[in-house]
Curated annotation (Swiss-Prot):
Residues modified by glycosylation: N49, N59, N160
EC main group: lyase
Name of the gene: S-2
MF GO annotations: ribonuclease T2 activity; RNA binding
Name recorded for this polypeptide: Ribonuclease S-2
Location relative to the cell: Secreted, Extracellular space
Residues reported to bind RNA: H53, D91, L92, K94, F105, K112, H113
Length: 214
């Protein structure tokens, strides 16, 4: 292969592997179940409700991460906004004081994911959108109302069908190695108004085994 051909191949691969700024095709709201998370990592606090891990713009062909590293994260200073975020999007590994003081978790999520939709949502809008979507379903109460309660094991199919009945789309489920429910991803179309089935879900494989909701 000639030098010019190698250069062309390299350029094509670079384009294929590089994220496309602002070209997301769907959005995934990832909610963490703190009880399972805190059995894996040391936590300073363990809420008994689903908390936000992140709001991730993505597309079907290329994983979107760090779309604009030059875009700064400006720390939140409004006390009410910080408390609202900490209630819904806490850094479980940090105390509330450290979390609000340094905002490291929010910064990491914004730089990695929020910059991939900043052509549509600025920093304030991005975090407000995540909180709005999280509050929309009140997932813990909705699961309980649909017969999914803590302390019991359920099939993946049961969980998928129940969450679809609540949200309107099949989720992306993540489990721990002990097959405890760790995260639920809810996917939205590019308008972030309509729930869709999550593309290529992990689904806590193998799907023929039960999943504990601790």
């Amino acid at each position: 292969m000639s030098k010019s051909q190698l250069t062309s191949v390299f350029f094509i691969l670079l384009c294929a592997l590089s994220p496309i700024y602002g070209a997301f095709e769907y959005m995934q709201l990832v909610l963490t179940w703190p009880i399972t998370f805190c059995r894996i990592k040391h936590c300073e606090r363990t809420p008994t409700n689903f908390t936000i891990h992140g709001l991730w713009p993505d597309n079907h062909t290329t994983m979107l991460n760090y779309c604009d590293r030059s875009k700064p994260y400006n720390m939140f200073t409004d006390g009410k906004k910080k408390n609202d975020l900490d209630e819904r999007w806490p850094d479980l590994t940090k105390t509330k004081f450290d979390s609000l003081d340094k905002q490291a978790f929010w910064k990491d999520e914004y730089v990695k994911h929020g910059t991939c939709c900043s052509d549509k949502f600025d920093r304030e809008q991005y975090f407000d959108l995540a909180m709005t979507l999280r509050d929309k379903f009140d997932l813990l109460s909705s699961l309980r109302n649909h017969g999914i309660s803590r302390g019991f094991s359920y099939t993946v199919q049961n969980l998928n069908n129940t969450i679809k009945a609540i949200t309107g789309g099949f989720p992306n489920l993540t489990c721990s190695r002990l097959r405890e429910l760790k995260e639920i991803g809810i996917c939205f179309d590019e308008t972030v108004k309509n729930v869709i089935d999550c593309p290529n879900p992990k689904t806590c494989k193998p799907t023929n085994k039960g999943v504990m909701f601790p």
